[in-house]
Amino acid sequence: MVKKSRARNTRQGTNRYFIIGFSTIIIILALLMTAACVSKTNDQTKEPIWSIDGSNILSFRHRDLEAPQTILIEDTANYSLEKISYDSYGTTVYGLLRIPKNVSKPPVVVVLPAATVSKEEDSPMADALSSWGYASLTLDERGNGGETKGISPMDFTTGFEGYRRGDMPAQYAQIYDILVGYDYLQSRKDLDGGNISVLGESMGGRFAVIAAGMEPGFKAAFVVSSSPYGLDAGNNTDAIRFVDSVEPATYLKKIPPRKLVMFHFTNDTIIPIAYGRSLYDNASQPKAWYQYNGSVHGVYSDIYAPDLHAELMSVFGR
């Protein structure tokens, strides 16, 4: 379905200066192939927490919610806002938990912002979710300019080197952070732990697909302005396994019978709509595709809000 833009989102250019476009893939591939020459120095005395199966799908042997802390930073007539943190594989993850008032045990949406967008900058999405009666946990991703420190999951060269050593690549650590965030929400008695979905914008959309594929407790995956990475690992076996394990398309088959819902704008210059559609076309039912005229990329917009709200109501049942 195509919908005309009713208004231009004033934040649509927030992350324009970041792009993992197909024009940069040749550079990334060159770095991956260079890294493939690094000797394998896996420390056999320390078993990795992660493993890759025969389909190159990532899994973790266990997940540990460590040192969770909560600070109330805002309390209004309509919602409360808490800053939460927890330790997660070498760093401390920070997030903002917004809980609507006058809603008993609300469903929750885990929000994963686009590249260069912090949890605070993504507040329009949290505002909308709260107005619809949903809580939201918006995470600062690793190395994305927010409070959560660490190597960026966009650094594929360092990630591949870590993979070959048997360390935790940043790409895996980012997914681990999200899944531990899910576990944190499960521990909250004031939230509906049986009604949690994940929503990602641009870069965060890729993480959302992977996280939903790995954690069956997520009720659905919502993806705004995202696509496959489209990396080609050549003929190197290790590179193929690593690239497949971080590629969202690998995890599409793990999402059904839960729903994948995607939103994209026709004139998106950061991730062209054809790239987003390729991810959608590779997914199985149930799924839904919404496209709109305009160039909004990777942020909340009133343009797609009614469709997002309707899909959330369908998933959560309220």
Give a label for each model feature.
Residues 1-40:
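Secretory targeting signatures
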Residues 112, 139-141, 224, 292:
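Alpha/beta-hydrolase
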Residues 120-175, 233-234, 239:
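Cap/lid segment of the alpha/beta-hydrolase catalytic domain
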Residues 232-283:
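The feature captures the conserved acid-bearing segment of alpha/beta-hydrolase catalytic domains
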